[in-house]
Regions:
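Acidic-enriched catalytic cores of C-N bond-cleaving enzymes acting on peptides and small amides
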Residues: 202-203, 218, 227-234, 246-256
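Bacterial N-terminal signal peptides that target proteins for export
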Residues: 1-10
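Acidic/His- and Gly-rich active-site-bordering loop/insert found
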Residues: 26-148, 167-174
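Bacterial N-terminal signal peptides
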Residues: 9-19
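Short small-residue beta-strand/loop micro-motif enriched in glycine and branched aliphatics
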Residues: 142-144, 243-249
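Sec/Tat signal peptide C-region and signal peptidase I cleavage site
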Residues: 20-25
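Acidic/histidine-rich catalytic neighborhood of metal-dependent amide-processing enzymes
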Residues: 142, 147-228
Length: 256
């Protein structure tokens, strides 16, 4: 993750939510927040490094329930008044709310788990989150670590924006409802149990949309904001001509 992009990503967060209501429409209103982002840069980088060091890998049953507890703490530290660990039949999730007294509410999707890794394939420990000067390609200072891009880096940048807004004495123009899961990397098998809880579902129904922080800034600094996304579905399709009554009753070559 490119270090100075923390500033840019946090400002992008402000721009997205500032567009809902004109609370931060003037540049003068954004100036103290931008200054706070710059002042808290090292703090934000350290927060991400610490988070990368807290590994949760669902496929290896590693880092639970500590990963969920850590996620809840990050939310509370960023200003969420409520952050609760929700147990499921699999790995726990986190449900958090930030009431800014605003007329509109935005949902947030977070994931705190990462893919498994082989340390031998890394130039430095994937849990160390080492800062290196990347020359090829010329990126400058970057963090090397599992989750730096997918997905803790973008999420940490979002949380950094919340810290900066509060530090500048400003109030968010929207309320936030966060749902964070710990099984995204294995296909989110238990997220229905999380989002269908009556209290979580009630909060989500009040949201005008759902935002997922992601690494969408290219090397030229251009940012792409996705306005929609598709989910994942796994299924097994069985075509049985015999039962249908209009096809072969035994196995045939696939070309037929």
């Amino acid at each position: 993750m490119r270090i100075h992009r923390h500033f840019t990503a946090a400002v992008i967060t402000l721009a997205i939510f500032g567009g809902i209501q004109c609370s931060y429409s003037a540049e003068d209103d954004l100036a103290p927040i931008k200054a706070e982002i710059a002042k808290r840069h090292d703090e934000a980088v350290k927060r991400l490094q610490d988070w990368i060091g807290q590994v949760s890998i669902a496929a290896e049953n590693r880092g639970y329930p500590k990963g969920a507890e850590y996620m809840a703490k990050l939310a509370r530290d960023a200003g969420f008044q409520q952050a609760t660990v929700i147990n499921t039949d699999g790995k726990p999730g986190v449900f958090a709310k930030l009431d800014a007294g605003a007329p509109k509410t935005i949902g947030l999707y977070f994931m705190y788990d990462v893919k498994q890794f082989d340390p031998a394939e890394w130039t430095s420990s994937p849990t160390e989150a080492r800062i290196v000067d990347k020359q090829k390609p010329p990126l400058g200072k970057v963090i090397i670590g599992r989750g730096a891009v997918n997905q803790k880096g973008p999420e940490a940048a979002f949380l950094a924006a919340l810290h900066a807004i509060r530090g500048a004495g400003k109030t968010l123009p929207v309320n936030l409802v966060m749902v964070a899961e710990g099984e995204e990397e294995i296909g989110s098998p238990h997220i229905p149990q999380l989002v269908r809880r009556p209290d979580v579902l009630d909060a989500l129904k009040k949201c005008v949309g759902v935002f997922m922080p992601s690494a969408t800034q290219d090397l030229d600094g251009i940012v792409t904001v996705n306005l929609g996304s598709k989910g994942v579905i796994e299924l097994e399709l069985i075509s049985d001509g015999e039962k249908w009554g209009r096809g072969p009753a035994k196995d045939i070559h696939s070309s037929l």
